[in-house]
Regions:
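Domain-scale detector for complete catalytic domains at protein termini or as standalone homologs
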Residues: 1-89, 93-264
Length: 264
């Protein structure tokens, strides 16, 4: 397993790969949410997983509560891996982090990803229209998490030690969402593909379509018959779609009958 700094893990190093795909996890989880992704792409792509402080291999580090404060260290660790074309996939919170990475790279290095894939995330310019929850008492916080995003694993809910480990990370990640401040800039030049779940009650289709404003390139919206965490329930279809847009071939695919598409 390869490691760039502390922030980037490349599970299957492919030094001759023509492209890299950086994957940004959703709130409360680490890079293992993308377990198996590296195995499902052919040798022409190297998959690199973003590992933020406070989770998995960085458990002893305090999590960030601000996307802006996260950027310098993340970009420093990412920079050695930007020697070939690259793309970003971010899910929920991870999509906003990926978007801000792209804009920071444009400002600092005049580099942009070839493609941004955003899953289950409202467009970054839209206001956050949900009541604050980062500081709620534990029981109310857990109840609100289940209401918005689905139930946490039973082993987390029932184990006091696990709750003590996981809840600070979740609160910090929710703080990143709630405290995010969008600053208007010119649209990115890269293509943007947005994925949504038809059963996701947290993110409206109109909020997904608003990503169109963030690119001067091609925009594509694809909907899965899933909820907010369709990256698990529809993993094969999602990988098939990402690979197709990157002109790659996943090692394993399934029919895409559960996918609806809007392209511009």
């Amino acid at each position: 397993m390869g490691l760039s700094g502390r922030s980037i893990i490349c599970p299957k190093r492919r030094p001759d790969a023509g492209q890299r795909l950086f994957c940004f996890p959703h709130a409360g989880v680490g890079p293992s949410v993308f377990r198996g992704w590296a195995d499902q792409f052919a040798a022409d792509a190297e998959v690199c997983l973003v590992q933020l402080p406070g989770r998995e291999g960085r458990l002893r580090e305090s999590p960030f509560e601000s996307i802006a404060n996260l950027m310098p260290a993340l970009l420093a660790d990412m920079r050695p891996l930007l020697d070939r074309p690259f793309a970003f996939y971010g899910h929920s919170l991870g999509a906003t982090v990926a978007f801000e990475c792209a804009r920071n790279l444009r400002r600092a290095l005049r580099l942009q990803p070839e493609h941004i894939f955003a899953g289950a995330s409202p467009a970054p310019q839209l206001p956050w229209n949900h009541s604050p929850m980062r500081s709620l008492p534990e029981d109310r916080f857990l109840s609100e998490m289940e209401k918005r995003y689905g139930a946490l694993p039973r082993e987390v809910i029932s184990d006091a030690e696990m709750r003590a480990l996981v809840l600070p990370i979740l609160r910090a990640d929710i703080a990143m969402i709630e405290e995010y401040k969008y600053s208007p800039e010119a649209p990115l030049d890269c293509h943007i593909t947005v994925f949504g779940g038809l059963k996701d009650h947290m993110v409206k289709r109109s909020e997904l379509e608003a990503w169109r404003e963030q690119t001067s390139g091609r925009f594509l919206l694809r909907m899965f018959d899933g909820n907010h965490l369709f990256l698990k329930s529809h993993k094969d279809q999602l990988l098939h779609s990402v690979a197709g847009e990157m002109n790659l071939s996943p090692e394993t695919t399934r029919p895409m009958s559960s996918l609806k598409e809007t392209r511009t």
